[in-house]
Amino acid sequence: MEHNLSEPVRKEIFSALVEAQDQDMPVAESRREIARRFGISDEMLRVIEREGLDNHWPPFED
């Protein structure tokens, strides 16, 4: 499934990750929790995280 994630789903995952970290969850723990919640690998989560940061996805819009 994770290889076919649409952009809206990737943005949802990124937003959930940012929200978890904004709630003072440690980065490593937030990555594990969000990967588990969405059923994706840690590697895929990191790809999505990088994509979101590089493209200024919400909540980091210009």
Language model feature labels by segment:
Residues 20, 52-53:
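The DNA-recognition helices of helix-turn-helix-type DNA-binding domains
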Residues 55-62:
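Short Lys/Arg-enriched helix C-cap and helix-to-coil transition segments
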Residues 49:
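DNA major-groove recognition helix of helix-turn-helix
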Residues 30-35:
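Short alpha-helical "recognition helix" segments of helix-turn-helix
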